Amino acid sequence: MMSVRLMLVVAVWLCLRVDASQDVMKNLSMNFAKPLEDCKKEMDLPDSVTTDFYNFWKEGYEFTNRHTGCAILCLSSKLELLDQEMKLHHGKAQEFAKKHGADDAMAKQLVDMIHGCSQSTPDATDDPCMKALNVAKCFKAKIHELNWAPSMELVVGEVLAEV
């Protein structure tokens, strides 16, 4: 009887952790994308970039447009998440994650995932936008593996609430 209770407590805790993680990822995504319109104007990016961001967490949605990678770089720069070499600044990225709901462990895990994706994707030295796009694809896959991707209903609800 005690082991059944323990299993139930663990199962409930894991479900709450996943829901909390999805909520944090929703907050991070919404705040990361706030300067998107500025980046689109500054870089003359097409509306397809907005579509990619809108569908970013949708499972099975493939984004291949290098302009989306350029937008990711622009957003990261505007949010001061990059160092002088245009690489992720781990400390600032962890602070950004914590500011938007992640605890220390989750913030570190997110930055470690992005760093791992950056290391595992081939360098496109002649095209930093494609490198950013490939890192984003890898990161998205890792978030889905953890079941941390926010539901589309949550994201759409937030977007509609801000309009």
Curated annotation (Swiss-Prot):
Disulfide bonds join C39-C74, C70-C129, C117-C138. Antenna. GO terms for biological process: response to pheromone. The keyword Glycoprotein does not apply. SMART domains: PhBP (SM00708). Residues 1-22 form the signal peptide. Keywords: Disulfide bond, Pheromone response, Pheromone-binding, Signal, Transport. This major soluble protein in olfactory sensilla of male moths might serve to solubilize the extremely hydrophobic pheromone molecules and to transport pheromone through the aqueous lymph to receptors located on olfactory cilia. This is Pheromone-binding protein. It comes from Heliothis virescens.
